[in-house]
Amino acid sequence: MDKKIQRFSCTTILVGKKASYDGSTMVARTEDSQNGDFTPKKMIVVKPEDQPRHYRSVQSSFEMDLPDNPMTYTSVPDALGKDGIWAEAGVNEANVTMSATETITTNSRVLGADPLVASGIGEEDMVTLVLPYIRSAREGVLRLGAILEDYGTYESNGVAFSDEHDIWWLETIGGHHWIARRVPDDAYVTNPNQFGIDHFEFNNPEDYLCSADLKDFIDTYHLDLTYSHEHFNPRYAFGSQRDKDRHYNTPRAWIMQKFLNPEIVQDPRSFALAWCQKPYRKITVEDVKYVLSSHYQDTGYDPYGSEGTPVSKKVFRPIGINRTSQTAILHIRPNKPQEIAAIQWIAYGSMPFNTMVPFFTQVKTIPDYFANTYENVSTDNFYWTNRLIAALADPHYNHHETDLDNYLEETMAKGHAMLHAVEAQLLAGETVDLEEENQKMSDYVQGETQTLLNKILFDASNLMTNRFSLSD
């Protein structure tokens, strides 16, 4: 079998319902391709008749029968499909979400005790195997955990599940073990590509879950690195403290926490950054977009900034990186009619150059502009148009920044207005066609994105190296 595809570059933020501006749970993650690669994406709805009953992986020899009662769910799979499904993020008809996966770190002690399984599951498979069959976030943890125990995994991953009430975060440990923690309601979680959970209570199954033999596994292989053994730190036991982490991972958690808790002074290279924090104020969708677009603004680490040195500007990996494929914010809102409670905000391409677009998820189809991505570059779909804007704007980012900011603000305002209008119509007893509303949102965004591309191309052409100020 060919070498497995690994997308070890994602960034996750989770927002508990008492930490969010509207009482919602929010799960968000950038899906980033490996260095030197770009992965076209599309957003679709998977109906029960389209869900496989016998699943076969492309990346490994894994296969299994699936239940015959799948629910409809949204998905953001690879557009070309040659490497497998890679569904990544979605909401099912029970308004339960799943985001998979955040590739995380491990260590040789763990792998020596429970090696990875070449024939197991990976990021390619997880959403397809779990999301259509779960009716709560907790059920998602338990279903994925059972599959991990039975079949194993060939990579280390973090996975988020949410519903109206709870967010759960699961991290794999070696080939067959796993651990999960419920996100505190008044907190947010920042998780770059490293093992994150830093506190666990074995005697509190309401908020903590794990594979059945995890305590014995820890004791047998001397994995608990704390002195007292009273405060178990899974990150010490199962994670890493590598030089690479200080440049690739910890700075991303630091910059998110710097924005959401500016009163806390921390070191971007610290291995002690908390997995979860209570923000200084409630967190909005716009905040989530901002932190997932971060390139260390207003620090010496910003590759586009005026501060710092040529060395400092390249020392840390940005969150808003060039090779982001798609970003989803899975937004489950309380006290709303069931058919509009779940919103999937979607973006394609590099985050500093794009916008987040909200779609109702209890539908049968997604507009073509977001669902019909193909291999060749085109302005007929949202993915490639965003890629073109980013590539054109990047060399002169500061020149284009105002246009990009205006586009973001105007399109997200339109998104909020659409959500408010539909809710008002339903409360007034009117019938609303959610697919039609999604289409109107798509049409609006398509027009605004084309206008932005026109402006960016015009300005970028006037900034070309071979320009000359005189003409006949």
Swiss-Prot record:
This is Probable dipeptidase A. GO terms for molecular function: cysteine-type exopeptidase activity; dipeptidase activity. Keywords: Dipeptidase, Hydrolase, Protease. It comes from the Bacteria. Signal peptide: none annotated. It holds the Pfam family Peptidase_C69. The keyword Hydrolase applies. NCBIfam families: C69_fam_dipept (NF033678). PANTHER family: LD30995P (PTHR12994:SF17), SECERNIN (PTHR12994). Its EC number is 3.4.13.19. It catalyses: an L-aminoacyl-L-amino acid + H2O = 2 an L-alpha-amino acid. InterPro entries: C69_dipept_A-like (IPR047804), Peptidase_C69 (IPR005322). It comes from Streptococcus pyogenes serotype M18 (strain MGAS8232). It is an enzyme of class 3 (hydrolase). Belongs to the peptidase C69 family. GO terms for biological process: proteolysis. The active site is at C10.
